[in-house]
Curated annotation (Swiss-Prot):
Main location: secreted
GO CC annotation, single: extracellular region
GO terms of molecular function: acetylcholine receptor inhibitor activity; ion channel regulator activity; toxin activity
InterPro entries named in the record: Snake_3FTx, Snake_toxin-like_sf, Snake_toxin_con_site, Toxin_cobra-type
Keywords on record: Acetylcholine receptor inhibiting toxin, Disulfide bond, Ion channel impairing toxin, Neurotoxin, Postsynaptic neurotoxin, Secreted, Signal, Toxin
One Pfam family from the record: Toxin_cobra-type
Expression (tissue specificity): Expressed by the venom gland.
Source organism (scientific name): Micrurus mipartitus (Red-tailed coral snake)
Protein name: Mipartoxin-4
Residue pairs linked by disulfide bridges in the UniProt entry: 24-45, 38-59, 63-74, 75-80
Protein's cellular compartments: Secreted
Length: 82
């Protein structure tokens, strides 16, 4: 009985995937935007503007630091960088 219970617990853990994965919108070229699961450890979604135009979206470990003429918006919910 204990073996059966242990087997069921292991199967449940594998099926549920207890590791949570953030989903963010990604955009690397004009008109090409999708939602994807972020790599492990990248739990921040960001949106990057340059001179007022959105030029990229994606996942990050920390909110990126803007360079000249760049602005970043970062958030912590799934697909919050729409």
């Amino acid at each position: 009985m204990k073996t059966l219970l242990l087997t069921l617990v292991v199967v449940t853990i594998v099926c549920l995937d207890l590791g949570y994965t953030r989903k963010c919108h990604t955009k690397n070229s004009p008109g090409r935007e999708t939602s994807q699961a972020c790599p492990t450890g990248q739990n921040i979604c960001f949106k990057k503007w340059k001179k007022g135009e959105i030029i990229s979206k994606g996942c990050a470990v920390t909110c990126p630091k803007p360079k000249k003429d760049e602005t970043f918006q970062c958030c912590l919910k799934n697909n919050c960088n729409r």
